[in-house]
Amino acid sequence: MRDLKTYLSVAPVLSTLWFGSLAGLLIEINRLFPDALTFPFFSF
């Protein structure tokens, strides 16, 4: 039961950090390439 409580307290923290960093990355990409439908570094 103690391990379950530890897991339930760690998972929200890790998901908050993950989604926060993902949102920050998307914000920075949109700041550097505003309104880009195709990104120049993905074109071959």
Swiss-Prot record:
GO BP annotation list: photosynthesis
Cystine residue pairs: none
Location(s) in or outside the cell: Plastid, Chloroplast thylakoid membrane
Alphabetically ordered keywords of this record: Chloroplast, Membrane, Photosynthesis, Photosystem I, Plastid, Thylakoid, Transmembrane, Transmembrane helix
Membrane topology qualifier: Single-pass membrane protein
Keyword Chloroplast applies: yes
One GO CC term on file: photosystem I
UniProt keyword Chloroplast present: yes
Gene3D superfamilies: Single helix bin
Function: May help in the organization of the PsaE and PsaF subunits.
Alphabetical list of PANTHER family matching this protein: PHOTOSYSTEM I REACTION CENTER SUBUNIT IX, PTHR36082
Family: Belongs to the PsaJ family.
Protein name, UniProt field: Photosystem I reaction center subunit IX
Protein source organism: Arabidopsis thaliana
